[in-house]
Amino acid sequence: MFILTRFSDKHSRPITQCSYMAAIELEQDYYLHNFKALLKTVEQYHASLLTTDEKHWLQSFQQLSADAQMLLIRLLSRKGILFRFNKLNYEEITNINLAKDALIHAQFISQEITALHQQQVISISDIFSLYTKPELQRLFPTLIDKTDKKAEILLKLESYDDSEYLLSVISEPLVMIQQQTLLAKFLLLFFGNSHQDLSQFVLSDLGLNKFENYQIDTSTQLFHTTEQVNQWLALTQLSDLYWRAHETKDYDTISSVVPLLPKAASWLPLENKRQKLINHIARDLERNYQYDIALALFRQTERTPSRERQARILMAQQQYQAAYDVVKNIQYDPKNEDEYGVSLRLEKKLAKSVNQIFTAPKTFAPKAIQLQLANPERQRVERCAARYFESQGWTVFYLENQFLNSLFGLAMWDIIFAPIKGSFINPYQLAPLDMFSSDFYLKRKDLINERLQAIEQGHFDGWQTHFETKQGISNYWVHWENFSQQALTLALSHIPPTQLAMMFRRLLKDLRHHRSGMPDLIMFNDTGYQWVEVKGPGDKLQDHQLRWLAFFDQHGIPAQVAYITFSTPSED
């Protein structure tokens, strides 16, 4: 039997949207309840990180009517800070005009657009970008040519010397949110990161995301000072600016971010975030042949692949000895297996240029078979291979990394979500905060070792229970939509317990990097099981795949590579 499952990204987090769950109808004011829950947590646990003005904002919000609160939340949730009021239409708000007036009176929003422009809070472009090109042509028929693009129109209006006239043409109310950045701060304090937002509440309300009922550690906070919060938010703004430029390959804007980067931070979470951004910027500038700037940036970071990129830039600049020195530094103290593997390839390329002899390490050659298969439907090579093995009597699962990762998540479920200090700071986490650091193992060493010993002895207590009772609950490791009861049953009945424990031990050595590179197929028959990595024409084994295959070979775990070629119709 061939069980085919496929997902979009082999390195992605588990899919938690459950298609089998019935649709849930939300109350019209669902977002008001969610926002109040957000504010309650911020006030209760993070008050020391709020300024006097921010505390006043919270108090003023509580005094608003429900309509005014909902309108403010709607505006905060929209893109931008300026809005055409007449375009706003929310059925759940009984009287939107009264709500607007209340927000103006409490200084949450302003409609004094002329004054705001004179104070240089907003520009002419900010204001008129709210309008479509046809609307602008109707407003300013003598200033705009029909052939002008909208960007050209905005430039013309921005450079027009009578802004008072331009603003006088507007006959409808415009509103601007005051202190719009507050929402970003509240979300950051609540989630402890910059990528989750109010939509997370909605996904949970709809039942599309379910989370484990773990114990939240209210005594632990990611941020300890207001300065840390402000620095994080500022760095997030820079990061957002970079990613927008990256998407359009706007290298001028990317370069403009460089002088805005903050100095190295003593607070480790912020410094990690800073170095991650620097690596991205440096890599883009390297692609744009701005080698000197890219090299200077990479030298500011310790995160991989900084040293690899330094060596490659130096090679491109024909500074071979300097590149060789970087490579040797990597080999002396590699960050991980990937970095070490890359250093060997770079050393081989550099050896002749620096008058060194390169001694190639012994390479591992995995067991392999050659298959010529028909593919009239032009399917993925993994599907063709899976169907071939199915015809040979195997039950085949095309799961790649998801098979072993899901087993690991089920086996360690209670340990992953154990109440360890500092692990959980909000109700919407897929894993503890230290999941991919060395602290994960160190803080749970006794629990993990005890579990591994139990597995080696053939005790799989809790795996089936976790599969049944935790179904659909978000866990970074368990891929519910693809990992089936049959896959679990066959794994526990066919894989020797000692081999399962060995594979978990390798995962635990480096959870971030070892969670990928596993073979495409896992197969079972009456006599045993087999891993199979499938390679089509011209496809080569990657380093992390070779390392898993070498590990399997070392420990007697059955695995092979299937090299596939496709027969032509005349050969069938």
Annotate each language-model stretch with its function.
Residues 524-529, 555-572:
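Nucleic-acid nuclease catalytic cores
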Residues 19-57, 63-69, 74-281, 352-495:
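N-terminal alpha-helical interaction modules that lie
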Residues 263-355:
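Alpha-helical protein-protein interaction scaffolds
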Residues 79-83, 515, 526, 533-543:
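Short beta-strand-loop-alpha-helix junction that forms the active-site gateway
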Residues 536-558, 563:
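Mg2+/Mn2+-dependent nuclease catalytic core
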Residues 483, 487, 491-503, 520-538, ...:
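Conserved catalytic cores of phosphodiester-cleaving nucleases, focusing on short active-site segments
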